[in-house]
Amino acid sequence: MAKVQLVKVNILDRDMYQNDPFPTLEWIRLNEPVYQDVNGIWALTKIEDIRLAERQAQIFASGIIGSRPNGVAQPSMIDSDDPSHADQRRVVARGFTPRQMAAYQTHVEEVARRLVDAAVARGACDIVADIARPLPMTLIGEMLGAPESDYDKLQHWSDAMINGADDPKYVTDDVINAAFEYYTYISVVIEDRKKNPGDDLVSKLVVAAEDGSGMDDEHVVGNALLLLVGGNETTRNVITGGLEAMIRNPEQMTIARRSPEDLERAIEECLRWVTPIVNMVRVTTEDVEIRGVKIPKGSQVIMNYTAANRDEDMFVEPHTFDVTRSPNPHIAFGWGPHLCLGASLARLELRSIYTELFKRTNTIEFADPNYQPVYSHASFVRGIQSLPVKFS
């Protein structure tokens, strides 16, 4: 690759991520791995550096402006530092224990089977609309204790608010209305759970808030929103993007179909390949130096997971989709104290959907042989918007 000087770019450019960000990110990673963009925002693009920063959460703070650039920290664990972060995480983790996931497995498999059966019976479907979107929405809706009749509006609120998460300048009337409607809705739910607690996660959060955990109603609202948005967007995009990669590389799908062990490795490669959360931002609480580059106190520093998951120092042929890749030290779920709590649920959903799809089909192909994916116009998440396929 030619070592030409890249014109300074906006590391949060939506157009770049919607199109093909990888040539630009590769140049940055190879030439200026600790990169300051045209707006003065820093970016870490290598796994070693991101792990270092994430382990030093007291220096690379999440609670100053929150997890999004130029933002305002919200009352949720993702936008908090210890000890508040640890207190909130301890409570939310009650919904994601190994015992909880083991108990939940049969139900997740049943939901996946129902969705796949309906799609395969028609001989064709849009993976996003018919499988990848409804699976996590159903499961997250249940965890929130929401009736099925509310799933569509919860989905709309989630999609709208994630669209405004890139930067405050993208907060439109639709985003504001969605936030207001969600806040009104979840506030009513919280009041109900105070009187009628159940087994759902909102009830667990409410009980913890009343038991002096350091949380209050605002933290319940914020963490329920985190569950809704995070649980929806990430799994949907990996189901879709992983399957798109396997269809485009049929020899890789053949390997993934062979055994449960092969599928597990394939899932990890799908996570690396898609990297559904592009980045998180931290703010430095003191002057720091990485790779000889000095980053001043008070700087916004992007953890660019999308760039890091193609790191040449960590992956052989990083731009090749290889379901046999092992080990696969990706950071699709982040790293350190803010490692995604829902990782085990996401893997369970991916395993369930792919298992059912492979079990019920001989082939999965693009409905249109000339299909090319259209990605979300965003710099926080990156996902395929529609994936029409046909089955045999």
Q: For the regions a protein language model found, what residue spans apply to each?
A:
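Cytochrome P450
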Residues: 1-392
